[in-house]
């Protein structure tokens, strides 16, 4: 039993003699290497005679992959941006204390400036309000006194107007500009080179247009005579040519007079014709009748129609009144 167990142990774990062999081999190899290293000729022979150890392709590929990965990792680490957000001063820095002192001084100065500004603004507003109140009271007092003075004097205060009168004629050397002839002036600065005409003539005038304007104004003033205009109006009114109603009435009156004259002439001609017919003498031709005169009625017929604007005959008025009453 013991032998079988020993054999099993040798098979599984190995014997002591087998374990000691590699150590002996290693010691011999080490001794050989030491002897070769001590002899230089042996070392040279080993260098020239020993074949070059070739590394397998898989090992090369593994090494190249590792080198590429290490290089890419280095590049990535260089290209990455590192952002550091600090919530406070870094105590590891040497100038941390100086930075703390600067920050505290800046915050304190800003607070002082803000407080000073608010205090100044408050004082300014208070002083301005007080001044406005005092000025308002003073103005009220002045206006009250002026109103009382005007009421006592009975004079109504006039509205304030500007000091410049735009309608007033301009004056040059105590003479109106419309009465000055530019040709008479010795100095004519607007003729100098580089002069601006708008400094001497307004509303786009120049020397020549201004002279024309002055002559036209002078002519209008001469033609405008209020007394002469009033006399002309009075003469027109006396002649009846001023109103259109007077003109129509005068024209109607002239027409009526002409018609009456024509009627009288026709009646006289009719009587003469009757006398001539009875005496046997030939009748002369009757004169032409006025175009506005209606034709003469026949004997025994109705009386002639009245002309427009004339009174009807007296014998027709009672008949018309009777007809109106019957209606």
UniProtKB/Swiss-Prot annotation:
Similarity annotation: Belongs to the FIP1 family.
Composition-biased stretches, type Pro residues, lie in 282-311
Query: Low complexity composition bias: which ranges?
Result: 312-327
Which compartments is it annotated to reside in? Nucleus
Top-rank taxon of the source lineage equals Eukaryota
User: What is annotated about its quaternary structure and interactions?
Assistant: Component of the cleavage and polyadenylation factor (CPF) complex, which is composed of PTI1, SYC1, SSU72, GLC7, MPE1, REF2, PFS2, PTA1, YSH1/BRR5, SWD2, CFT2/YDH1, YTH1, CFT1/YHH1, FIP1 and PAP1. In the CPF complex probably interacts directly with PAP1 and YTH1. Interacts with RNA14.
Please give the biological process terms from Gene Ontology that the record holds.
mRNA processing; termination of RNA polymerase II transcription, poly(A)-coupled
| Lineage start | Eukaryota, Fungi, Dikarya, Ascomycota, Saccharomycotina
Could you tell me what this protein does? Answer: Polymerase-regulating component of the cleavage and polyadenylation factor (CPF) complex, which plays a key role in polyadenylation-dependent pre-mRNA 3'-end formation and cooperates with cleavage factors including the CFIA complex and NAB4/CFIB. Pre-mRNA polyadenylation factor that directly interacts with poly(A) polymerase PAP1. This inhibits the extension of an oligo(A) primer by limiting access of the RNA substrate to the C-terminal RNA binding domain of PAP1. Seems to tether PAP1 to the cleavage factor I.
- Signal peptide (residue range): none
Q: Where does this chain mainly localize? A: nucleus
Q: What is known of its domains?
A: Circular dichroism measurements suggest that the protein is largely unstructured in the absence of interaction with PAP1.
Give the keywords, sorted.
mRNA processing, Nucleus, Phosphoprotein
> Which protein, by its recorded name, is this?
Pre-mRNA polyadenylation factor FIP1
State a single Gene Ontology molecular function.
Answer: protein-macromolecule adaptor activity
Query: Could you name the Gene Ontology cellular component terms for this entry?
Result: mRNA cleavage and polyadenylation specificity factor complex; nucleus
Span list, region Disordered: 1-82, 272-327
Q: Which stretches does UniProt call biased (Acidic residues)?
A: 64-81
Q: Which residues carry this modification: Phosphoserine?
A: 50
Which Pfam families does this entry report, sorted A to Z? Fip1
Additional observations: Present with 1310 molecules/cell in log phase SD medium.
Query: Gene name, please?
Result: FIP1
């Amino acid at each position: 039993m013991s032998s079988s167990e020993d054999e099993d142990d040798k098979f599984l774990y190995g014997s002591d003699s087998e374990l000691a062999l590699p150590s002996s081999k290693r010691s011999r190899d080490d001794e050989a290497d030491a002897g070769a290293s001590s002899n230089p000729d042996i070392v040279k022979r080993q260098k020239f005679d020993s074949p070059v150890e070739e590394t397998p392709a898989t090992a090369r590929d593994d090494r190249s992959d590792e080198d590429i990965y290490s290089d890419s990792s280095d590049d990535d680490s260089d290209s990455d941006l590192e952002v550091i957000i600090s919530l406070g001063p870094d105590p590891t820095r040497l100038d941390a204390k100086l930075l703390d002192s600067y920050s505290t001084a800046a915050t304190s100065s800003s607070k002082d400036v803000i407080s000073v500004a608010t205090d100044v603004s408050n004082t300014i507003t208070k002083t301005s309000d007080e001044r406005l109140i005092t000025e308002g009271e003073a103005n009220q007092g002045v206006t009250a006194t002026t109103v009382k003075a005007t009421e006592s004097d009975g004079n109504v205060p006039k509205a304030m107007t500007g000091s410049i009168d735009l309608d007033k004629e301009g004056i040059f050397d105590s003479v109106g500009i419309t009465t000055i002839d530019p040709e008479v002036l010795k100095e004519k600065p607007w003729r100098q080179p580089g002069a601006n005409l708008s400094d001497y003539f307004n509303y786009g005038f120049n020397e020549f247009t201004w002279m024309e304007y002055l002559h036209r104004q002078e002519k209008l003033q001469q033609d405008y005579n209020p007394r002469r205009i009033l006399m002309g109006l009075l003469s027109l009114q006396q002649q009846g040519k001023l109103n259109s109603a007077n003109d129509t009435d005068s024209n109607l009156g002239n027409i009526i007079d002409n018609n009456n004259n024509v009627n009288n002439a026709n009646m006289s001609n009719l009587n003469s014709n009757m006398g001539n017919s009875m005496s046997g003498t030939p009748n002369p031709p009757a004169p032409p009748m006025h175009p506005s005169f209606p034709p003469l009625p026949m004997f025994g017929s109705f009386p002639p129609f009245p002309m427009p604007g004339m009174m009807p005959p007296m014998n027709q008025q009672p008949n018309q009144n009777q007809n109106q009453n019957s209606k």
